[in-house]
Design a protein with these regions (language model features):
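C-terminal motif of bacterial Sec signal peptides marking the signal peptidase cleavage site
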Residues: 17-19
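Post-signal-peptide N-terminal segment of Sec-exported extracytoplasmic proteins
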Residues: 26-74
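Aromatic- and glycine-rich peptidoglycan recognition patches
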Residues: 2, 21-40, 44, 103-105, ...
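Structured segments of extracytoplasmic/periplasmic soluble domains
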Residues: 51-59, 79-87, 118, 139, ...
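Bacterial N-terminal signal peptides that target proteins for export
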Residues: 1-10
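Catalytic cysteine-centered active-site loop
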Residues: 36, 58-111
Length: 166
């Protein structure tokens, strides 16, 4: 004996609804980052520097990593590289400095290179993005904003540690 059409449709609908409500698997932890080697112009160093410069004036916020919420130094760097090149960097300046990216001699800096500093500690505590002509963009301190500074400024020259190219 055949079941009436509404009786056949109801079990199919219930089955479809049950399949839609299945729990989604939780994402696992992010893998440890190893920086790809960037060849001049490949990732778009100009895009990186333009994006970084466009964020000048954004308020500093400790732990911040968005234009809307403000930036700290590593949040700014992470945002720019993620936004422009799809590269997800570690969260702190020290962790970013430890990625497998080549160190760059101070005299060979190119736009988009990362510059790292030590402030009264042995470990890296600050990072910025080199934009050319001896300048870099960074989020320096509470109460300030993202800004351009010169690497040859006495303070930054004294605290400069290393540069890396991603």
């Amino acid at each position: 004996m055949r079941m009436p059409a509404p009786t056949r449709v109801l079990p199919c609908c219930l089955l479809a609804l049950a399949a839609c409500s299945a729990p989604h698997p939780k994402p696992g932890p992010l893998p440890r980052f190893t920086a790809p080697t960037r060849h001049h112009g490949e990732i778009g160093a100009n895009d990186i520097l333009f994006r970084a410069i466009a964020l000048v004036g954004t308020p500093y916020h400790s732990g911040g990593n968005t234009p809307e919420g403000g930036f700290d130094c590593s949040g700014l760097v992470g945002y720019v590289f993620r936004d422009v090149a799809g590269i997800v960097l570690p969260r702190t300046a020290e962790e970013i400095s430890e990625i497998g990216a080549p160190e760059i001699d101070h005299e060979r800096l190119e736009s988009g290179d990362l510059v790292f500093f030590r402030h009264h500690t042995r470990s890296i505590s600050h990072v910025g993005i080199y934009v050319g002509e001896g300048r870099f963009v960074h989020a320096p301190n509470e109460g300030g904003t993202v800004r351009l500074d010169r690497l040859d400024d006495p303070y930054w020259r004294e605290h400069f540690s290393v540069a890396k190219r991603i």
